[in-house]
From Swiss-Prot:
<keyword id="KW-0378">Hydrolase</keyword>
<protein>
    <recommendedName>
        <fullName>Serine protease SplA</fullName>
        <ecNumber>3.4.21.-</ecNumber>
    </recommendedName>
</protein>
<dbReference type="InterPro" id="IPR001254">
    <property type="entry name" value="Trypsin_dom"/>
</dbReference>
<dbReference type="GO" id="GO:0006508">
    <property type="term" value="P:proteolysis"/>
</dbReference>
<dbReference type="InterPro" id="IPR008353">
    <property type="entry name" value="Peptidase_S1B_tx"/>
</dbReference>
<dbReference type="Pfam" id="PF00089">
    <property type="entry name" value="Trypsin"/>
</dbReference>
<feature type="active site" description="Charge relay system">
    <location>
        <position position="74"/>
    </location>
</feature>
<dbReference type="InterPro" id="IPR009003">
    <property type="entry name" value="Peptidase_S1_PA"/>
</dbReference>
<feature type="active site" description="Charge relay system">
    <location>
        <position position="189"/>
    </location>
</feature>
<feature type="active site" description="Charge relay system">
    <location>
        <position position="113"/>
    </location>
</feature>
<keyword id="KW-0732">Signal</keyword>
<dbReference type="InterPro" id="IPR028301">
    <property type="entry name" value="V8_his_AS"/>
</dbReference>
<keyword id="KW-0720">Serine protease</keyword>
<dbReference type="InterPro" id="IPR008256">
    <property type="entry name" value="Peptidase_S1B"/>
</dbReference>
<feature type="signal peptide">
    <location>
        <begin position="1"/>
        <end position="35"/>
    </location>
</feature>
<dbReference type="GO" id="GO:0004252">
    <property type="term" value="F:serine-type endopeptidase activity"/>
</dbReference>
<keyword id="KW-0964">Secreted</keyword>
Length: 235
């Protein structure tokens, strides 16, 4: 991959405190720059597939099973995540699913930017994680020119952790690497890449630049990667 690839979300945009996740966000108005017509805000994330998407500080993740979230290694390892919380499908108007402390992290042993994050089942508000999220199903596969959507928290702190969905097309797949043109920004790292049936193809991990017209890259979930994830879902 080009050395100029920009990893999205390496720098945390806010620091969480013990008071919770969303409460620490600035009330000043913000907006996402250069957002095109294929980007929309999800104001109510209580329904599938949006209620499977979670916010980390500086990144995004997707729920795949009991207390189990998939994201990037660089998100899981950043900012001492054990001091932070995961916010389940936080959105600007809909009811969020709670804020959950991280229990442990399992990194994929290969080069792929993939990690499993397990959270404690009970939120700081007393909510049950598994009763407030949905589990995203894996796609059987994908091919070039398939339509996709990317759901996550671009510029999380600057947008007060509003959820956005962008759509695009797969341009290239090779092994565990995929390239697509759905719009993304810092904060979208770990965002689920879904097919038209809202099945999980992979997760976003990087982009080639700051302009929305440039390419974005994801970890494509091969059978081997799906097996790793499934073997690490809490029983």
């Amino acid at each position: 991959m080009n050395e100029n690839v920009m990893v999205k979300g390496l720098t945390a945009l806010t620091i969480l405190t013990s008071l919770g996740f969303a409460e620490n966000i600035s009330n000043q108005p913000h907006s996402i720059a250069k957002a095109e017509k294929n980007v929309k805000e999800i104001t109510d994330a209580t329904k599938e597939p949006y209620n499977s998407v979670v916010a980390f500080v500086g990144g995004t993740g997707v729920v795949v099973g009991k207390n189990t979230i998939v994201t990037n290694k660089h998100i899981a390892k950043s900012n001492d995540i054990f001091k932070n919380r995961v916010s389940a499908h936080h959105s600007s108007k809909g009811k969020g699913g709670g804020n959950y402390d991280v229990k442990d992290i399992v990194e994929y042993p290969g080069k792929e930017d993939l990690a499993i994050v397990h959270v404690h089942e009970t939120s700081t508000e007393g909510l049950n994680f598994n009763k407030n999220v949905s589990y995203t199903k894996f796609a059987d596969g994908a091919k070039v020119k398939d339509r996709i959507s990317v759901i996550g928290y671009p510029k999380g702190a600057q947008t007060k952790y509003k959820m956005f969905e962008s759509t695009g097309t797969i341009n290239h797949i090779s092994g565990t690497f995929m390239e697509f043109d759905a719009y993304a920004q810092p904060g979208n790292s770990g965002s689920p890449v879904l097919n038209s049936k809202h099945e999980l193809i992979g997760i976003l991990y990087a982009g080639s630049g700051k302009d929305e017209s440039e390419k974005n890259f994801g970890v494509y979930f091969t059978p081997q990667l799906k097996e790793f994830i499934q073997n690490n879902i809490e029983k």
